[in-house]
Amino acid sequence: MLRIHRVYLMAVLTDTYGDVPYFEAGKALYGGSATPAYDSQEDIYNDFFKELGECIGILMKGNNDAVTGDVTAYGGDAKAWAKYANSLRMRYAMRISDVAPEKAKAEFEKAVADTCGYISSNAENATITYIDGPFTLYDGARDLDFRVNALGEMLYGQDSDSPTFVSATLFNRLNDRKDPRLYRICRHYLNPKRSAVKADDAWNVDVTEEVVAYQNSDKGDGPHPCDIGAAWWHNWVNAPANEDIPTLARLVNMYPEVGFDQSNYNARMMRPFLSIQLEKAECPGILMTSTEVKFLLAEAITKGWNVDGSIEFYYKAGIRDAMEMLNQYYKIKAITEEEIQDYLNSTTTEGVSPESIKEMINYEAWILHLMNPAEGWANLRRSGYPTLENRYNYPRWTSDFTYDDDDLTTPVRLKYPNLEAKYNKANYEKALQKLGGTDDWHHRVWWDTEPDHVTPLNP
């Protein structure tokens, strides 16, 4: 179990930074080096396949003693862990498919053929359980608690005056496609007294239906997600009259001391928030899902790999699983069968070019990976989809922000942590040499060969 999870975590690290310490990493306590060498991403990925294959072999012997301290939904089930490991093998094979196509094909087909199987339903998803603890990303915090809901920790916002809102990048795509997930993922709240450390219902008053009705009325002017590259206060949204939002009017009358219509809280409710139902302690942490596996199988068929079934089947089955997973894991208004079927009827891969199919599959994967942002970013870079807005077409808010980099193209890696230069200086500098001497956001990692897909520059 630990070996499988180490592969998962090290994949996040190498996908984020590129070359990282791997073979010598984490061994100082046991007599190893405290200054581990950086290994190439290619060598790291090759070891992933070796590790996962060996783990599957051990687990398929049915020895549950190989799985101890399990904090996932699998409850120590060795064969469930084998399916998870095999599904990860499919993920990482697809990841290297542009840079090492023969290796990728061989590993993917090996996973498909393995008798251990792979994650094929939401009941088999790999998830972890969070503790019911406070968020630690608030004003003055020094550390992050990785045991609490990760989406909530990073995206809930620091306090009632520093919330996080949904950008037009996500909102407009869901809205334009009449996607039933839109107002399950996004909600509107009145929350001047909300907790800084917990996604609570008490002081996040949901006014979504009232706000949407107002925005779609003669008085309104449509939805107002945050502009690309902007803060929520840019391109200011005017608040409606209190009586236009009945809950607002009622709360102002009942609790005048709270200030529901003061300090712009009534204007903030016009911006969509990420639903707090995705940020609560009881929500699972997503590692690997049947939806992702089905999308991987669909894309594998487009590459001519040996996979039974059709692109259309896996594509639509993946979408269905994604919507049903939202119903299963989160306390949202359930997406109905009619809504699911209407959405499925609106999209098809039949009669579509292979590149367009790739875009369709990976757009849906992008929506799915909202719950697993590291995987979402990695898959976007690997696939090149969805097409992003060209940041150069949008304002630079220099009066509010400091720009550390004049290159506004989408980052393709993160800079190494600053402490590496202090505590592992020699190896850090060797790693920089492979980057051309500069630790920046724009040097692609080994497997990232796909050109960025962005909208054209405005004339």
Put a short name on every predicted segment.
Residues M1-H5, L9-D321, M325, P354-S356, ...:
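Structured, solvent-exposed acidic/aromatic patches
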Residues K294, A300-W305, E312, K316-P459:
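C-terminal functional modules
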